[in-house]
C-alpha cells in the first residue's frame, strides 16, 4: 500500500524564509514531545496516537535544521542515540544552524528522555529520510530503531512501534530487498505476540502478508494468515489492509464470493485520503465481480479521482458485457502493461471463459435456433476447428445451466428454449435478501465501531451488587437483633 501512504513532494528552492518557519516547526515538535511525555506518564495510549497524527500533519514541513534542534532538545547531546540520529541528517549552512541553535537554546532540554521520546526521534528521522529519498540511510536508521525497540517492553510504545515496523518494511521494499527482512518480521511478530502487543501483531501480520504476496507466495500467506491469532481490530487502517490482502488471497484460491466481500469492505473502510489504496481495492473488486458473472455499475468507474486509473477496467468490463472475444483480446493487449503492474494479468486470462459464456448467452436469447457454424463466427473463435470448439462450449454451458437450450448434433444446431418470467423464480427474492443482509452487516459494523465508556457496565453491576449487599447486611443485622431479643 505504497500509493496511499508515501507522500511525494517537490524539492523546495533555498530561501531566507527558513529562519521564520523553523522555529514554528520546532515549537510544534516540542508540543508533540510534551504530549508524548504526558501520555507515557499517565499510560494513555490515545495521547501518543494523537501525537503521531499531529506528526503526519507536519511531515511536509520537516527540515533538517528543525530536526537537529529537536534532537538537541529531547536527547542528551553527545549520547549514543543522539550521535547516531544526527549522523543521518544533512548539514545545513551556518546561518540556518545559528537560528535553530538560538531557538533551541532558549528552552530547557529534557535531561532524562523517556523511551517513548527516543523511539519518536527515530520515527521522525526515518520519515524525513524516506521523504528525501535517501533510502540507504533510511534502511540503516530503521534497522537501528528496530534493534532499540526489542529492548523496550512498554504498551505506551506500541503505537510508535507499529509505525516504525511499517516504515522499516517500506525502506526495504523501495530498494527491492523486501525478501531480506522476512525472517526479521516473523521474529518481531513472535515478540509482539509474547508481549501481547495487539497493534504490533496487526501491523506485522499485514507486513508479512504483503511480503509474501509481493513474491506471489499465496500458499504461504494463507498458511500464516490462518495460523496467526485474530482479535478485535485496533486500527481501522490496518484492518482495511488485512481485508485487502485477504481478498487477494481468496481471489487466487477461486473463492470469488468471499473475495468480493473482503475487497468491497476494505474499500469502504479505507480513509478518504487513501486514494491509491481505494483504487487498488476497486480494481481487484471489479475483476472479481466480472469473474462472478456480475457487471459493475457505471458509477463504480466514475468515482472522484479514480476515472483515469479505472479506465482500462472500464473498457475491459464493456468487452465482457458485450461478450465480444475480439474486443476483449484487443483491450487485454492494449493495457497489458497496466494489468501487469497491477498484478491482475492472470485473472484477466481467466475472464476469457466468462466473455465466451456472455456472448453465448446473448446468442441464446436472440435466436431460437442457430447453427454451430454461426455460433463460432459470432463468438469469433480463432481455433483450428472452431465448429468443434463451439459444440464443446455450448455443451458445457448447457450442463452448467448458463443457457437453457438443447444441442442437435445431427443437424449441428443449438435450439434455445423460450425464456421464462424471471419474476416467477426465486432470483428476485435472493437479490433482495443479499441487499438486506448487506445493510444489516453494515449496521452491525457501525455499532461495533462505536466507543463506549470503559467498564461502564461493570460499574453499574458493582453498584447494584453493593446495594444488594447493604440490604442483606441490614436484614442480617435485624435478624440478629431479633434473636438477641428472644434470648432475653
UniProtKB/Swiss-Prot annotation:
- What are the entry keywords? Nucleus, Proteasome
The record ties this protein, via SMART domains, to:
PAM (SM00753), PINT (SM00088)
Signal peptide (UniProt feature, chain positions): none
Q: Where does the protein principally reside?
A: nucleus
Q: Which Pfam families match?
A: PCI, Rpn3_C
**Entry's localization field:** Nucleus
| Alphabetized InterPro entries for the sequence | 26S_Psome_reg_C (IPR013586), CSN3 (IPR050756), PCI_dom (IPR000717), WH_DNA-bd_sf (IPR036390)
Q: Where is this region: Disordered?
A: 1-20, 452-488
Could you tell me where the Basic and acidic residues compositional bias lies?
456-481
Could you tell me the superkingdom of the organism this chain comes from?
Answer: Eukaryota
Q: Which residues form the PCI domain?
A: 240-421
**Molecular function GO terms recorded:** enzyme regulator activity
- Give the transmembrane ranges: none
What GO terms describe the biological role, i.e. biological process, of this protein?
regulation of protein catabolic process; ubiquitin-dependent protein catabolic process
Please describe the quaternary structure of this protein: The 26S proteasome is composed of a core protease, known as the 20S proteasome, capped at one or both ends by the 19S regulatory complex (RC). The RC is composed of at least 18 different subunits in two subcomplexes, the base and the lid, which form the portions proximal and distal to the 20S proteolytic core, respectively.
Q: Which family does it belong to?
A: Belongs to the proteasome subunit S3 family.
Role noted for this protein = Acts as a regulatory subunit of the 26 proteasome which is involved in the ATP-dependent degradation of ubiquitinated proteins.
PANTHER family per UniProt: 26S PROTEASOME NON-ATPASE REGULATORY SUBUNIT 3 (PTHR10758:SF2), 26S PROTEASOME NON-ATPASE REGULATORY SUBUNIT 3/COP9 SIGNALOSOME COMPLEX SUBUNIT 3 (PTHR10758)
Name listed for the protein in its UniProt record = Probable 26S proteasome non-ATPase regulatory subunit 3
Amino acid at each position: 500500500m505504497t500509493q496511499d501512504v508515501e507522500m511525494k513532494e517537490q524539492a523546495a528552492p533555498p530561501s531566507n524564509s527558513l529562519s521564520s518557519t523553523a522555529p514554528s516547526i520546532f515549537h510544534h515538535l516540542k508540543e508533540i514531545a510534551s504530549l508524548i511525555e504526558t501520555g507515557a506518564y499517565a499510560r494513555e495510549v490515545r495521547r501518543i496516537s494523537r501525537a503521531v497524527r499531529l506528526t503526519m500533519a507536519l511531515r511536509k514541513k520537516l527540515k533538517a535544521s528543525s530536526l537537529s534542534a529537536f534532537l538537541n532538545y529531547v536527547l542528551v547531546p553527545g549520547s549514543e542515540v543522539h550521535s547516531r540520529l544526527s549522523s543521518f541528517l544533512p548539514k545545513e549552512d551556518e546561518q540556518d544552524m545559528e537560528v535553530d541553535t538560538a531557538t533551541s537554546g532558549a528552552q530547557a532540554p529534557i535531561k532524562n528522555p523517556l523511551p517513548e521520546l527516543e523511539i519518536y526521534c527515530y520515527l521522525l528521522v526515518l520519515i524525513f529520510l524516506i521523504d528525501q529519498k535517501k533510502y540507504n540511510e533510511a534502511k540503516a536508521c530503521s534497522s537501528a530503531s528496530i534493534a532499540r525497540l526489542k529492548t523496550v517492553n512498554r504498551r505506551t510504545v506500541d503505537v510508535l512501534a507499529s509505525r516504525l515496523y511499517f516504515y522499516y518494511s517500506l525502506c526495504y521494499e523501495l530498494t527491492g530487498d523486501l525478501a531480506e527482512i522476512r525472517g526479521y518480521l516473523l521474529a518481531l511478530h513472535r515478540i509482539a505476540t509474547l508481549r501481547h502487543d495487539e497493534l504490533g501483531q496487526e501491523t506485522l501480520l499485514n507486513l508479512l502478508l504483503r511480503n509474501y504476496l509481493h513474491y506471489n507466495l499465496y500458499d504461504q500467506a494463507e498458511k500464516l494468515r490462518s495460523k496467526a491469532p485474530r482479535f478485535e481490530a485496533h486500527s481501522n487502517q490496518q484492518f482495511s489492509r488485512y481485508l485487502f490482502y485477504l481478498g487477494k488471497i481468496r481471489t487466487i484460491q477461486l473463492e470469488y464470493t468471499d473475495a468480493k466481500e473482503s475487497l468491497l469492505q476494505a474499500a469502504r473502510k479505507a480513509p478518504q485520503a487513501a486514494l491509491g489504496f481505494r483504487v487498488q481495492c476497486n480494481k481487484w473488486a471489479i475483476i472479481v465481480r466480472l469473474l462472478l458473472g456480475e457487471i459493475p455499475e457505471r458509477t463504480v468507474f466514475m468515482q472522484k479521482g479514480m476515472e483515469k486509473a479505472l479506465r482500462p477496467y472500464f473498457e475491459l468490463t464493456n468487452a465482457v458485457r458485450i461478450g465480444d472475444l475480439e474486443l476483449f483480446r484487443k483491450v487485454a493487449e492494449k493495457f497489458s502493461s497496466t494489468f501487469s503492474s497491477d498484478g491482475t494479468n492472470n485473472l484477466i486470462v481467466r475472464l476469457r471463459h466468462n466473455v465466451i459464456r456472455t456472448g453465448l448467452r446473448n446468442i441464446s436469447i436472440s435466436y431460437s435456433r442457430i447453427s454451430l457454424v454461426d455460433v463460432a463466427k459470432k463468438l469469433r473463435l480463432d481455433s483450428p476447428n472452431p465448429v468443434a470448439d463451439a459444440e464443446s462450449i455450448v455443451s458445457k454451458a448447457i450442463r452448467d445451466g448458463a443457457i437453457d437450450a438443447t444441442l442437435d448434433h445431427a443437424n449441428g444446431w443449438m435450439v434455445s428454449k423460450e425464456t421464462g418470467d424471471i419474476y416467477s423464480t426465486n432470483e428476485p427474492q435472493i437479490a433482495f435478501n443479499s441487499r438486506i443482509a448487506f445493510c444489516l452487516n453494515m449496521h452491525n459494523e457501525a455499532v461495533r465501531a462505536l466507543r463506549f465508556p470503559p467498564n461502564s457496565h461493570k460499574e453499574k453491576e458493582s453498584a447494584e451488587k453493593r446495594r444488594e449487599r447493604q440490604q442483606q447486611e441490614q436484614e442480617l443485622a435485624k435478624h440478629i437483633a431479633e434473636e438477641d431479643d428472644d434470648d432475653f
